[in-house]
Structures are given as structure tokens and as C-alpha cells.
Amino acid sequence: MVAKNAGMPATPADLINVDEVIGKYYDVVPDPNVPEQRVSFGTSGHRGSSLKTSFNEAHIVAITQAIAEYRKKAGVTGPLYIGRDTHALSEPAWKTAIEVLVANGVRVRIDSRDDFTPTPVVSQAILTHNRAADGTQRFTGEGLADGIVVTPSHNPPTDGGFKYDPVTGGPAPADVTNAIADRANELLGDFRNVKRVPFEQAVKSDLVERFDFREHYVADLENVIDFDVIRSSGVRLGIDPLGGASVNYWPLMNEKYNLTIDVVRPQVDPTWSFMTIDHDGKIRMDPSSPYAMKGLVDSLNNGAWDKYDLVGGTDPDADRHGIVCPNWGVMNPNHYIAVCVEYLFGGNRPGWPEGA
């Protein structure tokens, strides 16, 4: 059933208390004997809320220690790329992870601009690092990299998320996440085997390296996107990052490729006070939801379409997108993805081999 306030602007009563959410991250200690308070990996890592004692400092300490132990057993000897999105709990968890990783002797690469990092950007950093000189991907051998993304994706502002990307650059398979979760839950009840140093010490360590995620990612886009076609088309594009990690990537794309993509709402607000309410009565930054996107659609229908031919949206970690069209609104993702697939496999990619 759709909530009565679905699609309506968020009110003060809908907003989180950021100080409370962060405070409980540090102050509340989970009980490993309570199932709801244990580490549990889903399809995209461990998720929860500090307000429900399901995403607290102890969880991240235990998970990160388990990851450090796992990558050592798996022979992953290269750097670990770590990024975070714009949720209130993401920066505290990011700091906690760095404390544990450095204490375990893991070489960590963080954003040189101290900026938010989309999930695809961390994946691309891992894949390019692990690429051989002949262009093939390496999944075994010395010096391979892996990563962590601190994000609960498009979930509400109260939530936190923490996911591990192995050397393949994508989500870890079930056998890996199960092993990490099992070890993390062992540690959750006994921190004697956890290594950790204060953040101020960790971030100054030689093990922490600054890496320009944004420049590295944007520079690689020309290898997969024909920007000449976009420029010559004259199409007027807008993008709404929905207060997420992609917000500062679009201006660099404009600068580097001479584009004119307009960032519709560039603000970052951990309460997401500018959102409209999703179908279940919660604030949720889902660019494929017509309820969550109604604020954007309404502003476009009230005259902003004069500036755009097409507008897109991305969720907080920018691995989910939505498309808004004039006289239609939010498109069904399955519909336009089907059209894209038909186009790509219909002979429009001459560089692709027949067996692709």
C-alpha cells in the first residue's frame, strides 16, 4: 500500500537528527547474541542503522578486521581503494575502517580531494589497477587491488552501509561475504584480536596514499563513451545527483569533454530535506521511483523543461540511475534498458566482435 504522503515534500518531522545518528554510531554497542544486531551481508554488503544498533562502530571495526584477514589469506597484496557516499554514517565508518586497515598493515588509497566517491569509481580504480599491460584483466598474482565502499545505496538517511569489492571490482560473491560476516561476528563478541590505531595517526601513515579518483575516472570515460556524438547532437542534458556522491563529477566531465550537462540540484544535505517522500512514507533517494523523483518532475513541469531535452538522476553512491522525459515523467528502467540492449546488439557497435 502506498503511503498517504508519498510524493509529497519532506517535512521537518521526516528529517533525521544528524548528531543523534552519528552519536549513536559511537556510543551504542551491539549485542552479538541478538540476531538483529549481528553482522549480516546482503547483496551489497552490511547495512543497518545506528538507531537500531545494526550499524555501529563495533560492526565496522569487526568487519574491517575480517576483511584485512580475508585479503591476507586470499593473497591480495596490492592497495585497497576506499570510498564513501554522502550518508551521515558514511564518513564515521570510513574513518573507522582506515584505523583498522592501517593497523593491519594494509596499503589504503583514499580520495586526494577528500571528496565523496561513487561506487562505480571505486570499481573502475580496482579494475584499471589490476589490468595487465596487454589490456587483459588479472585476477590472480602479486600486487592486485581490492576495495571498500561505505554506502547504503539509495536507502534512507538513517542508514549506513559497508561493502567489500574483491579483485574483480564488483560485489563480493556469497562465499566471500559469508566468510567475512562469520569472522566479523566472532570478533564482535571479543575485540582482543582486533588491530586498530587512532585516525589522526592512521591518516598520516605512509600506508595511506592519496589518489585522485575523480580525475582517474573521468579521464577513462572517453574509452567507452563517444563524446563527439553527444556534443554534435546538441541535446540539452540535466542531471540530479539527488544529493549523492556524483555531484562533483559532472562539472569535471563538462570541463574535460566540452559538455554542457547542467547539475539541477547540486546541494549535499545528509537529511535530504529537499526530497519528496517515497512510496512507503520514508525519504529514499531512489532515482527510479516516481515518488522520490516527484519534486524534480514537478520543477521540470513548471517551466524547467525549457532548458532540457532529457534529465537523469543518480542515487547516493551513483550506481543506480533514472531518466525523466518531457510529457512522461520517470521512465521505467526495464523499458529503456531493453531499448539500449536492442540498440547495442543490433549492429550499432561496429567495433564489437560477432560473438559479443
Model-derived regions, located:
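An N-terminal, well-structured beta->alpha segment
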Residues: V2-A103, T128, L207-L237, A245
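Glycine-centered structural positions embedded in regular secondary structure
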Residues: T64-A68, V100, D146-G147, G161, ...
